[in-house]
A protein has these predicted regions:
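NAD(P)+-binding Rossmann beta1-loop-alpha1 motif at the extreme N-terminus of oxidoreductases
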Residues: 1-46
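Internal alpha-helical scaffold of NAD(P)-dependent oxidoreductase catalytic cores
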Residues: 24, 98-107, 114-210, 235-242, ...
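NAD(P)-dependent Rossmann-like dehydrogenase/reductase catalytic/cofactor-binding core
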Residues: 2-3, 43, 188-271
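Rossmann-like NAD(P)(H) cofactor-binding subdomain of soluble oxidoreductases
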Residues: 46, 54-117
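Structural motif
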Residues: 30, 46-50, 86-88, 129, 131-134
């Protein structure tokens, strides 16, 4: 059994705990009764960062992770402990932390969870992605995951590529939702049944059947898609790239979404 620490006990933190429940696990969350941060880090070989990354001023807000890493790295510097970032962070973040704390070992490994089925998804992954530049870190993290998921497709890569995978997946699915809503509107105008059209489309193996549903609320909401598409738009602007498509998707969502639930969900949007 491995000694694991979880920092942040929300959906992602609980998913990590559920995944590795046969190991020795401690968790810290400042908002609930939990083990003190110092004890979690000192007693853990692998420390999973499962903290919120809300958006603020049209870009990602990493302040919660920043605040925690300042304390965590005091205990991980010059040790064999590995910090595994599970939080969704914009590409380049893990490298930034590696340079800021060069005596600590970092890895990025994204989660791909549906909010309503996060425990089920956590133990039935399509693939596992391990992003680390240090080959020894890769080897140790892969060994941890291989013991739990011996038959799951596993990718080894650098942390920035791993971070990009998460944003590509989430923002593509958000775009797919908006496209489905637009075709739904067309079908209504033409007085035809969208669900019948959809049924004939999704048998095409290239399409994938998920995220074609259109809800009464329209568009997308929740904890992930809104903050992630805003964060990626912000990164594009920081890199002087053109985010026209992403901006169009987000603006369309703001226009059609009846319930902007992300405004009220804690840690999705910072004040």
């Amino acid at each position: 059994m491995a000694n694991l620490g979880i920092i942040g006990y929300g959906i992602v933190g609980k998913a990590v705990e559920h995944t590795f429940k046969d190991n020795n696990i401690l968790y810290y969350d400042k908002f609930i009764k939990s083990t003190p941060l110092k004890e979690v880090v000192e007693k853990s070989e692998f420390i999973f960062i499962c903290l919120p990354t809300p958006f603020k001023n049209d870009k990602i807000d990493l302040s919660i992770i920043d605040e925690n890493l300042k304390e965590i790295t005091k205990l991980t510097d010059n040790t064999n402990k590995i910090i595994i970032i599970k939080s969704t962070v914009v590409p380049g973040t893990t490298i930034k932390y590696s340079r800021l704390y060069p005596k600590t070992k970092f890895c990025f490994s994204p989660e791909f969870l549906r909010e309503a089925h996060y425990l089920e998804d956590a133990v039935n992954p399509d693939r596992i992605i391990i992003g680390a530049d240090d080959l020894d870190v890769r080897k140790r993290v892969i060994s941890l995951f291989k013991k739990r998921f011996p038959n799951v497709l596993m990718f080894e890569t650098d942390p920035t590529s791993a971070e990009t995978v998460k944003y590509m997946a989430n923002c593509f699915l958000a775009t797919k939702v908006i496209f489905a809503n637009e075709i739904h509107d067309l079908c209504q105008k033409l007085k035809i049944d969208y669900n019948k059209v959809k049924e004939m489309v999704i048998v095409d193996k290239r399409m994938g059947s998920s995220h074609f549903g259109v809800t009464n609320e329209k568009g997308f909401g929740g904890k992930c898609f809104p903050k992630d598409i805003v964060a990626l738009i912000g990164l594009y602007k920081d890199l002087n790239l053109d985010p026209t498509l992403l901006e169009t998707v987000w603006k369309k969502n703001l226009k059609i979404r009846k319930v902007k639930d992300w405004e009220d969900i804690p840690f999705v949007k910072s004040d």
